[in-house]
Amino acid sequence: MTDKIRTLQGRVVSDKMEKSIVVAIERFVKHPIYGKFIKRTTKLHVHDENNECGTGDVVEIRECRPLSKTKSWTLVRVVEKAVL
């Protein structure tokens, strides 16, 4: 049995916590009746050990063991810094 570690890419929505960020993941879901593709957003709490992310950054995250009640993802790298 092979365990593939899930990795996702999203945008940082909040960086106000110490060593934690909130990342919004956008995905498209087909409506069951009408067939139109709808944009859905999932917010995930992510562990940021070095506090290197800011709001608006595009980041890559991966799944890990539960670190707290809501955190079970960790930061892999910052793909793109936000332009302020």
Curated annotation (Swiss-Prot):
PROSITE patterns: RIBOSOMAL_S17. It comes from Citrobacter koseri (strain ATCC BAA-895 / CDC 4225-83 / SGSC4696). One of the primary rRNA binding proteins, it binds specifically to the 5'-end of 16S ribosomal RNA. Keywords: Ribonucleoprotein, Ribosomal protein, RNA-binding, rRNA-binding. It comes from the Bacteria. GO terms for biological process: translation. Belongs to the universal ribosomal protein uS17 family. Transmembrane segments: none annotated. The keyword Ribonucleoprotein applies. This is Small ribosomal subunit protein uS17. One of its GO terms (molecular function) is structural constituent of ribosome. One of its GO terms (cellular component) is cytosolic small ribosomal subunit. Pfam families: Ribosomal_S17 (PF00366). The keyword Transmembrane does not apply.
